[in-house]
Design a protein with these regions (language model features):
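Substrate-binding/catalytic subdomain of NAD(P)-dependent oxidoreductase enzymes
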Residues: 156-218, 228, 332-333, 586-630
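Mid-domain beta-loop-alpha active-site segment that forms a flexible
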Residues: 111, 136-154, 173-185, 194-197, ...
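Aromatic-enriched alpha-helical interface/lid elements that frame and gate functional surfaces
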Residues: 217-223, 227-323, 638-695
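Terminal low-complexity tails and localization/encapsulation signals of metabolic enzymes
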Residues: 205, 211-213, 217-218, 232, ...
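Glycine-rich beta-alpha junction loops
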Residues: 94-96, 173-179, 235-237, 244-248, ...
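N-terminal helix-loop segment corresponding to the beta1-alpha1 unit
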Residues: 1-165, 314, 384-595, 619, ...
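Short, well-structured beta-strand/strand-turn elements
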Residues: 11-12, 321-336, 441, 695
Length: 695
């Protein structure tokens, strides 16, 4: 959270215990850039006084202890805000302070994931393969929590510019991951058959007939939609196509592959209005609607397989990108870190770290167009004494308005009008998030939708909350007038569109400045960084970024068997929170300086945060050997799944610091003297001796 705020220009002091961070990783170089690091012992009175002195000069204070732990150390947020009502305090516990069952758990990432059901809901592929639970090393809870916490902190900050009052915010990581995966958790009774995919049908069939879930990877591929799967290319690399649900993308794809006319001749049709019940369609299939019937899916996929073998993945990437339909090669993370586009766009940046030297790190997650360049050259982490840090904080003067109502409980965004032009998940979720804090949101959709009802209606159950909606044909004269009037009436405009489309709509900085000079514009897209790169204008979705940045190859375990991570929206919701942070930052800048800005984020920028434990490179770095593949049980013997006597699995979460304590227990006696490579077998035997509830 503080790294994200530091990238946006905040002065950050980070407190570590005397022995340094508990988590020893090169990723700390990224997490602590733009920070002064001080070592303080919060378990002694002197350390508490030092911390209180630093807090006395801060605008925002962030802690991630278990609920009540910080107060027990002598730093009570409630008391501090009683003394300084302008202070913003942010708590990020693993489990909520009112979760009486779990609040005291040592809530490491894997514990939160196991408790929240993440490892038992890792996608339809894993269900059909019979892999359950399924481990993932991605820190989903921390990544979602970081974006929720940073956006809420800045929303509270901009609200303080109007009221003079701070606030207390709690972002439990377990709650964050539940919202982050909300698009995987939609269950509708009586859902029409048109929305049920081939994989879902196969799962239901096997459950009814009592058949095992034991499909191979190859068998699974034949259950995928042809516009939502990977294809083998001439160079042996897989290429991921993501062209379902859109009126034009699937058609452009088939035309580029040279098989569109052939398929039309065979009977492939396009319905004029796919929102009608399928019983009223002229045919049983409509190109651009997800999912396709199996007979058509098989026929189209067979032809696509043949054509993809005629070119390399890189060639196809250029064809898809320039043709304005989504597709990308499957890459490993190491390839993405050193990719030309990642470098030139600022999605990956060089930082001169004092320990690792020149280090490639993820670029900023969120930035403002007018000042984003500064975030490409962060100051490396620096260790200082407390007096130096305190002196720097004192130099930062805060001017606040006079408090007129000390009991003000209005929403952070009350009185702010937002125009939502977004589609799919990330953009609409961003604005729905703003609505919960009091923003008045107007959602504008085309009268003739480009996306099918799977995208607009099903996903809209979540992201349409808190909005008023209008359907307008903006290509007509009257429609353009209506859009113009709406643009003039709002404070904020949010859209996930490429720059050329933004210019066509008159929402570029110059044109918007003439229509509504006070309006803040926020853009979300697929491949943008602070600077332009060769793929900046390529269109794409969450899954495409998973493919491009190495998430799918890690999850599947190999280049030839990449897998989508979970179902949908793994990065989308993070990016949505990033869009909200962009809006909040621009609002704060406007209130603080009068400058009207343009917020930016992208799915690719958020992928760096999601992979932050592994997303770095430097000379001398070891192998990129993060846990990968469908059968990996965990990180190591101390953090992994173990089979128990009750016939299920237990997530054991420990570390090297715990070895003496474990060795003191009768059940684990002898673990301290074991070589590390013998721990798995030792612990497997122990956990198999009793049930999960007993453990």
């Amino acid at each position: 959270v503080a790294m994200i705020l530091g990238d946006l220009g905040a002065t950050v002091v980070h407190v570590d215990p005397p022995g340094g961070p508990l988590w020893q990783s090169p990723a700390n170089a990224t997490l602590n850039r733009n920070k002064l690091i001080v070592n303080i012992d919060l378990k002694v009175p002197e350390g508490v006084e030092q911390a209180r002195a630093l807090i006395g000069e801060a605008d925002i204070v962030i802690e991630n202890f278990r609920p009540g732990k910080f107060a027990a150390l002598g730093i009570d947020f409630g008391a501090l805000r009683g003394e300084r009502p302008e202070l913003i305090t942010l708590s990020i516990p693993g489990f909520a302070s009112n979760d009486q069952e779990r609040r005291e758990l040592r809530a490491y990432e894997s514990v939160i994931a196991a408790s929240s059901g993440v490892f038992t809901d890792m996608g339809l592929n894993r269900v059909l393969m019979g892999v359950n639970p399924s481990f993932s090393p991605l820190p989903l809870a921390s990544a979602y929590g970081a974006m929720l916490a940073s956006s809420s902190a800045v929303l509270a900050l901009q609200s303080r510019e109007r009221t003079g009052l701070g606030d207390h915010v709690e972002v439990p990581l377990a709650s964050a991951v539940m919202e982050g995966l909300c698009y995987n958790s939609i269950k509708i009774e009586g859902l029409p058959d048109r929305y049920i995919t081939q994989r879902e049908r196969e799962i239901a069939r096997r459950r009814v007939e009592g058949l095992p879930m034991n499909l191979s990877y190859e068998e699974l591929q034949e259950l995928l939609d042809p516009f939502y799967r990977s294809y083998l290319c001439k160079d042996g690399r897989m290429f991921y196509v993501v062209c379902p649900s859109h009126k034009n993308h699937a058609k452009r794809c088939l035309q580029a592959l040279g098989i569109y006319e052939e398929l039309v001749a065979e009977g492939l049709t396009e319905e004029q209005d796919t929102y009608l019940p399928t019983a009223e369609w002229q045919s049983d299939v409509s190109l651009g609607v997800y999912p396709l019937p199996k007979d058509w899916a098989d026929r189209i996929a067979a032809k696509m397989k043949e054509v993809f073998l005629t070119r390399t993945a890189k060639e196809w990437e250029r064809i898809f990108g320039r043709g304005r339909f989504p597709g990308a090669p499957q890459r490993w993370l190491q390839e993405w870190i050193n990719d030309d586009h990642a470098e030139t766009s600022g999605l990956m940046i060089d930082v001169q770290d004092p320990e690792y030297g020149t280090m490639i790190q993820p670029g900023p997650v969120v930035w403002l167009e007018e000042s984003g360049e500064a975030a490409l050259s962060p100051v490396p982490r620096r260790w200082v004494d407390v007096s130096t840090a305190l002196s720097l904080l004192k130099k930062q003067k805060t001017k606040l308005p006079r408090v007129t109502d000390p009991d003000d409980r209005s929403g952070w965004l009350e009185g702010v009008r937002v125009l939502d032009l977004c589609n799919v998940i990330a953009g609409p979720h961003s604005v729905s998030y703003l609505a919960r804090f009091g923003a008045e949101v107007i959602k504008l959709d085309p009268a003739s939708p480009l996306y099918d009802s799977w995208n607009t209606v099903i996903f809209g159950i979540s992201h349409m909350r808190g909005k008023r909606s209008a359907l307008i044909d903006i290509k007509s004269v009257e429609g353009r007038k209506a859009l113009h009037a709406l643009v003039q009436s709002v404070d904020v405009i949010v859209w996930n569109a490429p720059d050329n489309q933004i210019r066509e709509m008159g929402l570029d900085a110059e044109t918007l400045g003439k229509i509504n000079p006070d309006a803040i514009f926020c853009k979300l897209d697929c491949f943008s960084g602070v600077s332009r790169g060769p793929r900046t204008d390529y269109v794409g979705y969450d899954d495409l970024v998973q493919a491009s940045t190495g998430i799918m190859t890690r999850f599947g375990g190999s280049m030839h068997e990449p897998e989508e991570h979970a179902h949908v929206g793994t990065i989308d919701v993070m990016c949505g929170f990033g869009g909200a942070l962009g809006v909040a930052t621009a609002l704060y800048q406007k209130l603080n300086t009068g400058r009207v800005g343009r917020g930016r984020t992208s799915l690719s920028a958020n992928s760096g945060l999601l992979q932050i434990p592994f997303c770095y490179d430097y000379l001398g770095r070891g192998l990129f050997n993060e846990p990968s593949g469908r059968y990996v049980p965990g990180y190591d013997a101390l953090t992994r799944f173990y089979y128990t006597a009750s016939g299920d699995y237990l997530l054991f979460s420990s570390n090297e610091h715990d070895i003496p304590s474990l060795d003191a227990l009768e059940e684990f006696k002898g673990i301290a003297s074991l070589p590390k490579d013998e721990r798995d077998a030792f612990l497997s035997g122990i956990f198999a001796g009793d049930t999960s509830p007993a453990w």
